[in-house]
């Protein structure tokens, strides 16, 4: 008997009987688990990466200093870029994996989680290097390893929130915020416990890169063949609310301060860029030693023109001497989203592309950029010069 019953030809309603949801992971669920933690790409996934559905032959310069390869090998990234921008005349494309330094050609990059002590909140920084001397980078690499492990531990706090009675208040808050009924909450509890058990049972086989919050979303998506889409959709809405509550409670004490990260990175010749401007207004006020500010991001589009004018006004006033603040835009593309079947993709994330920042060609924004002499080609040349 099916645990989820489709009611009516159009399946407008979905009910779930928790008595018929197995308490232990089934073989099907075990297979789903190993599927979502796998870093091996199938032939279909390779095609999805190397043969993008849309290309941009009219874009002549490619600037991408905020994007995440995740488990996609760099040679496949290169093939995708060649297909996306067949007439590119110049590029600066640097990967910025979360808390892991990755290399592409002569350049390396990372997006670092840290915190701003003056404002007591988590922030992120983009670090970029050219020809980094790894033997000199031991301290930075240890800082990144520590941050990666601590940030990964949030997954277990997330799972514990979903299954442990001690965090019942968090679940009740998430349920109230999303109007989630008890059956869906119960379903999430059962499946989250299975996921936690599978993680602990197969600890030695789980790649480090898989230990992140999105594993929960991916695992539930992998259950769609067994459970009604409406049940999984409701579960995902509830899970997202619970995750945000976990993130708000996650201690900042074990992150490095932004100033410490910048100091160590600068000692190695790094360029530093502030991403996600609207999320991190305090960091813009802290006057950190940075090369640039991201004025546009798929998650941060509301104040682009304002930020462009702020940066240019500060530069004209000579606040930053001979190294004016550069204007960047971040595509914040996560390539793992491209690996999923189209029906399983998050549309808002799937539309992102490495090197694609439509704001450069927006007429209103472009007007501000032209007045201030800013374009992709100039930013590429200046930032490349600073990194060399």
Give residue ranges: language-model regions:
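Charged catalytic cores and adjacent phosphate/nucleic-acid-binding surfaces used
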Residues: 2-91, 99-157, 225-259, 263-388
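Low-complexity, highly charged intrinsically disordered N-terminal segments
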Residues: 212, 216-231
């Amino acid at each position: 008997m099916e645990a989820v019953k489709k009611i009516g030809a159009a399946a407008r309603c979905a009910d779930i009987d928790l008595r018929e949801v197995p308490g232990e992971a089934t073989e099907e669920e075990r297979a789903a688990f190993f599927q979502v933690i796998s870093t091996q790409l199938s032939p279909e996934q390779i095609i999805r990466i190397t043969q993008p559905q849309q290309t941009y032959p009219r874009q002549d310069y490619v600037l991408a200093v905020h994007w995440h390869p995740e488990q996609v090998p760099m040679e496949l990234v290169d093939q995708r870029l060649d297909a996306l921008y067949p007439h590119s005349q110049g590029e600066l494309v640097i990967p910025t994996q979360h808390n892991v330094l990755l290399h592409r050609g002569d350049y390396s990059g990372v997006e670092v989680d840290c915190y701003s002590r003056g404002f007591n909140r988590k922030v992120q920084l983009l670090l970029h290097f050219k020809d980094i001397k790894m033997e000199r980078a031991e301290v930075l690499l240890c800082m990144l390893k520590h941050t990666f492990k601590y940030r990964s531990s949030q997954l277990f706090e997330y799972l514990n929130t979903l299954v442990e009675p001690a965090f019942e208040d968090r679940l009740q808050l998430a349920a109230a915020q999303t109007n989630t009924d008890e059956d869906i909450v119960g379903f999430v509890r059962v499946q989250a416990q299975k996921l936690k058990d599978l993680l602990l049972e197969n600890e030695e086989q789980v790649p480090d890169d898989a230990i992140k919050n999105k594993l929960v979303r991916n695992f539930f998506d992998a259950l769609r063949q067994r459970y009604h889409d409406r049940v999984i959709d409701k579960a995902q809405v509830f899970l997202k609310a619970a995750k945000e509550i976990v993130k708000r409670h996650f201690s900042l004490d074990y992150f490095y301060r932004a100033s410490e990260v910048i100091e160590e990175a600068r000692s190695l010749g790094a360029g530093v860029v502030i991403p996600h401007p609207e999320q991190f207004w305090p960091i813009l006020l802290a006057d950190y030693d940075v090369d640039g500010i991201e004025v546009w991001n798929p998650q941060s589009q509301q104040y682009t023109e304002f930020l462009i004018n702020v940066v240019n006004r500060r530069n004209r006033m000579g606040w930053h001497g001979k190294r004016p603040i550069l204007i960047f835009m971040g595509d914040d593309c996560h390539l793992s989203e491209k690996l999923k079947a189209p029906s399983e993709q998050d549309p808002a994330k799937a539309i992102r592309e490495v090197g694609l920042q439509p704001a450069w060609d927006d007429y209103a924004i472009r007007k501000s950029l032209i007045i201030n002499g800013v374009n992709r080609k100039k930013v590429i040349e200046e930032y490349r010069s600073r990194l060399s």
